Amino acid sequence: MMEEYVVIGKVLDTFGLEGELKVRPYAPPEVFENLEKVYLKRKGGDWVPFEVEWVDFIDDKVIIKFKGYDSIDEVEQFKGAKLFLPKEELPELGEEEYYAYELVGMEVETDKGKKLGKVERVQDMGPYDALVLDKENLLVPFVSDIVLKVDKENKKIIVKEELLPV
């Protein structure tokens, strides 16, 4: 059986002069805290492992240093790349934490019972993530003021109707 990989972040830019990378995390901090290896996908489809030398956190970004990449010139090639982990290596999350892949396919409805559609994907909007729904490409900000409940068991997300951008 083929391993399933999950995106955990995206390289935004280089950081410093010694091969560090600034990453926008798509996963909670605990995924990065003990990170030993990440995977990037080659254009041909092969998964390439990279050993992680160290990880640091600055504001809402993650700084990662790969072993053996010690200059800015060596890591320029990674700008824009997505970082992956095999699904089975992801740590268990807390009660109110979710990986983006877990939300895909969930039904979204309002607290008044109106069905809005299924989550097609989770889109990075900068300061927050948004749920892209299959009906009319509706975007629902994935923020605590709007998302009232995520029911993993019943694959349902309840959102506050009066705060929706519709």
Curated annotation (Swiss-Prot):
Which GO cellular component terms, listed alphabetically, does the Swiss-Prot or TrEMBL entry include? cytosol; ribosome
Gene3D superfamilies with a match to the protein in the record: PRC-barrel domain, RimM
Q: Where in the cell is it found?
A: Cytoplasm
Record's keyword terms, sorted = Chaperone, Cytoplasm, Ribosome biogenesis, rRNA processing
Which Gene Ontology molecular-function terms are recorded? ribosome binding
Which Pfam families is this protein grouped with?
Answer: PRC_RimM (PF24986), RimM (PF01782)
What is stated about domains? The PRC barrel domain binds ribosomal protein uS19.
Similarity-based family: Belongs to the RimM family.
* Stated name of the protein: Ribosome maturation factor RimM
Organism, by scientific name, is: Aquifex aeolicus (strain VF5)
- Give the gene that encodes this protein: rimM
